[in-house]
Amino acid sequence: MTSIKNAELGWNEAGTPVSDQFDDVYFSNVNGLEETRYVFLKQNHLPERWQEFDQRRFVIGETGFGTGLNFLAVWQWFTEFRREYPEATLKELHFVSFEKYPLSKADLEKAHQSWPELAEFAEKLQQHYPAAVPECHRIVLEDGAITLDLWFGDIKDCMPLVPYAEQGLIDAWFLDGFAPSKNPEMWNQNLFNGMAKLAKQDCTVATFTAAGFVRRGLNEAGFAMKKVKGFGTKREMIAGSMEQREAHSNHLPWFNRTASTNHDSIAIIGGGIASAALAKTLVRRGQNVTLYCKDAQPAEGASGNRQGAVYPLLNGPHKGVSRVFAPGFLFARQFVDQAAQDIQFDHDWCGITQLMWDDKSADKLEKMLAGNFTPELIHKLSSEETAEKIGLPIDMASVHYPLGGWLCPAELTRGLIAKLENTELFEAKFEHQVKSLDWDEARKLWTLKANGQSFEHSTVVVANGSEFQTLSQTADLPMGQVKGQVSHAPATETLSKLKTVLCYDGYMTPVNPNNQHLCIGASYDRSHLDYEFDEDAQKDNAEKLVKCLPNQTWTKEVDTSGNLSRQGIRCVSRDHLPFVGNVGDFETIKTQYADLQNQQEQDVEAIHQFPNLFCFLGLGSRGLSSAPLMAEVLASQICGDPLPLPVDVLTELHPSRMWVRKLRKGKAITEL
């Protein structure tokens, strides 16, 4: 995973953007929109195919996003299609595109001025256009009717990372980009083979070029291509379809991800932000969801705090957790902003400032900065800049997350669920603690026992946080529990000047104007897993701030002596990553993979997993930054939709990952 550079542009006399990197225009100086419609939409027979399509979601792949012209054009046509054919089976359009040098937002907005008729669509894209962070960015538009997966990076690196199942992924390919003579590195057999691997059996493909090597290369990859009349004065272009696709997948057998075979009735066990985000994401897809919450209302557990910081957990040069949390954080921003249009909850994108408060923390943050993340995501501040940014005296440098901030997780969670309760697809059962799950193989249903009653569902998701051990199917998952206490301190005139969330060996939020208190925390206690007030933790929360900023007097104004606080128990993992996906059968896997270290990949059978049982656990203390994207991952998996993360990153989230790692090394998994 390498850093991303924005496109370097010039503008010609016609007002068309020209790439400095490739010395080529992004679209035709004359009738660029009409050419897009002719080459990519009409030659892929999209209006006709949409009418006859027998699935809920149609997936388009594109090899060069550029200004987004093709995406905006097909979005406009799909909107007209939905209006004209409201009863059609096809409800959603999914667009997967790649871009090595993404335009800056300013350049994107300028380019979009060329097409006034697309303005309503362009403005929505601009609103959620992502920062230049590598790999996949999912943008959900029109309440899920339109989804854009925008992959930033070289297509030769990104395309092999796109997850796909045996039946393929793409229904239509837009083979676009700068001319082959201008960008020969992209137009090669590896590209054509990659397109074929992602294609479904009935996939079509169209491209503006008539170059012989392109037609021959696509034919060799498995497409049947032919020359057709080009647009306007262009004599020819090529178009075709997949001739014969072999069934294959790029998921490793021991990290297999399978969709639900029946998601007519989905049960979610839990009541926190994970459950709420997942329920919203599934209902958006037209799924019937029932929530089972052991408490009288949502967000009574770890999701019940007044203020929680939202910022990405990053490490080194774009490795490990960064590949989950960087796009996860950006998606969380999108999710929260969209939720705020429908429900009320306290939040403020005021930024996050993380202090270099001692040598160890400074070294850690410098190593993180070595990853060359875009300044839109994170950048360093001097001590003077830090003081100006936070609004209070400070004598140390920091890193700043300008897109970060805080929100009230309790209000967000409850608001999401209350909104869902107004729909016909969702039901919440409070004070229903699920005691057991039993699978009926003959009927292909799960039976949930709660409150002395039995409930049946075709698919179940366990999202009950620190309660995961109460169900036998998830009891062996290698996760831990940590108690946390957050202290609430009243505002003072000085503390009210804090303008950003402040992180050190703890964190402090700005004053919430709606209750005139700030939050400071949070403790980590593995030995007392209860919800009782802890006086020592209360004192320690305040003392950490004084200890980390010994030269400042304002820190002593933080008064926690009123013992205002909240306790919760986090569900945590050793590698700081959530557990999202199919639940493995622990006892069977021990036998099935007893000799895994001596087997070749092609000889290994798919890992044994409980049918139609999934988990969404281990969010730890960064759940607000990861839960929305993890919900999108799991909902996509359950419904068989394209997945929004690289296939190798998905292995890092697989619920059986720690068992498999040990078994591949020949180690027992009885103790983890």
Curated annotation (Swiss-Prot):
Protein name: tRNA 5-methylaminomethyl-2-thiouridine biosynthesis bifunctional protein MnmC
HAMAP family: MnmC (MF_01102)
Spans annotated as tRNA (mnm(5)s(2)U34)-methyltransferase: 1-243
Localisation per UniProt entry: Cytoplasm
Family, similarity comment: In the N-terminal section; belongs to the methyltransferase superfamily. tRNA (mnm(5)s(2)U34)-methyltransferase family.
Function: Catalyzes the last two steps in the biosynthesis of 5-methylaminomethyl-2-thiouridine (mnm(5)s(2)U) at the wobble position (U34) in tRNA. Catalyzes the FAD-dependent demodification of cmnm(5)s(2)U34 to nm(5)s(2)U34, followed by the transfer of a methyl group from S-adenosyl-L-methionine to nm(5)s(2)U34, to form mnm(5)s(2)U34.
Cofactor(s) required for function per UniProt: FAD
Region of interest: FAD-dependent cmnm(5)s(2)U34 oxidoreductase: 269-672
GO molecular function: flavin adenine dinucleotide binding; oxidoreductase activity, acting on the CH-NH group of donors; tRNA (5-methylaminomethyl-2-thiouridylate)(34)-methyltransferase activity
UniProt entry keywords in alphabetical sequence: Cytoplasm, FAD, Flavoprotein, Methyltransferase, Multifunctional enzyme, Oxidoreductase, S-adenosyl-L-methionine, Transferase, tRNA processing
Major subcellular site: cytoplasm
Highest taxon above the source species: Bacteria
Source organism: Vibrio campbellii (strain ATCC BAA-1116)
Single GO cellular component term: cytoplasm
This protein's record includes keyword Flavoprotein: yes
